[in-house]
Amino acid sequence: MTTTLITHIINPLAYIVPVLLAVAFLTLLERKVLGYMQLRKGPNIVGPYGLLQPIADGLKLFIKEPVRPSTSSPFLFLATPMLALTLALTLWAPMPIPYPITDLNLGVLFVLALSSLAVYSILGSGWASNSKYALIGALRAVAQTISYEVSLGLILLSVIIFTGGFTLQTFNVAQESIWLLVPAWPLAAMWYISTLAETNRAPFDLTEGESELVSGFNVEYAGGPFALFFLAEYANILLMNTLSAILFLGASHIPAFPELTAVNLMTKAALLSVVFLWVRASYPRFRYDQLMHLVWKSFLPLTLALVLWHLALPTAMAGLPPQL
């Protein structure tokens, strides 16, 4: 009974609560970064230095009345935000920080598969809202996410060839001598840009272009359901950055200070997240055709070529004696 309680309730909660807290403060950090880049302060009234702002925002959203359009699909309209957040939090299960909650053999494939499922929550919410803006936003989001999934999958394949395993822990072992960022920097650059597109962030935020689509697929959402979408989006941003840190930014385990493993990984993920916000503050939005051309005409040929190269090189060298 106690073991079941620990494995099924306490362990997942020990993962979920810190992730949700991190998401709350990531929203505050985003507003602060954008504020300072626009030469203003950002939130600074609620609590010291505005630190209680995310809590106030969350409370405000959850006590608002969840208005539902009369023509929308009642079940799907409420089910999709829940699905989005559930998927976003489930994705954290195989993350080695430093130990995963479920030690999966195919952790990388699990992450790829579940992040593809997030498309259904976007599509469902856009369709269930019964609004033309929401539907256009959802269709854009689906096309964009599916397109960038292709390049993410191929980049992951290349990186797996480097490390020799689908478990996320093997990346720590493989990068003990050198960060994968050094030999695979073109892959790392394409991976980072693809994660920006995958999480619908600027300059790829076509799906929620305020100037053209009035907020995209979640235009009809208010209160609690909107807050769930919001939490899911930022949890995905943190997840993608944690994954980028695991894949490319070296082993999180420091032999001299093993207890700092989690701190090390969190610092790398936080720095990558700040770059996400920095990009948002700096770059204008892509045009939709440019967004699609980037992945299908630039990233796809490049990643395919690199996969072939990384497959061909070890095969060609396999017959050479080791002393050469």
UniProtKB/Swiss-Prot annotation:
Q: Which UniProt keywords apply?
A: Electron transport, Membrane, Mitochondrion, Mitochondrion inner membrane, NAD, Respiratory chain, Translocase, Transmembrane, Transmembrane helix, Transport, Ubiquinone
Biological process (GO) annotations held by this record are:
aerobic respiration
User: Where is it located?
Assistant: Mitochondrion inner membrane
EC number(s)?
A: 7.1.1.2
Query: Per its UniProt record, what InterPro entries does this chain match?
Result: NADH_UbQ_OxRdtase_su1/FPO, NADH_UbQ_OxRdtase_su1_CS
User: What PROSITE patterns would the database entry show?
Assistant: COMPLEX1_ND1_1, COMPLEX1_ND1_2
What membrane topology was assigned to this protein in its record? Multi-pass membrane protein
Give the top-rank taxon of the lineage listed in the UniProt record for this protein.
Answer: Eukaryota
List, alphabetically, the GO terms of the cellular component aspect: mitochondrial inner membrane
Family per similarity comment? Belongs to the complex I subunit 1 family.
Q: What is this protein called?
A: NADH-ubiquinone oxidoreductase chain 1
Instruction: Look up and give the organism this protein is from.
Output: Salmo salar
Gene this chain is encoded by:
MT-ND1
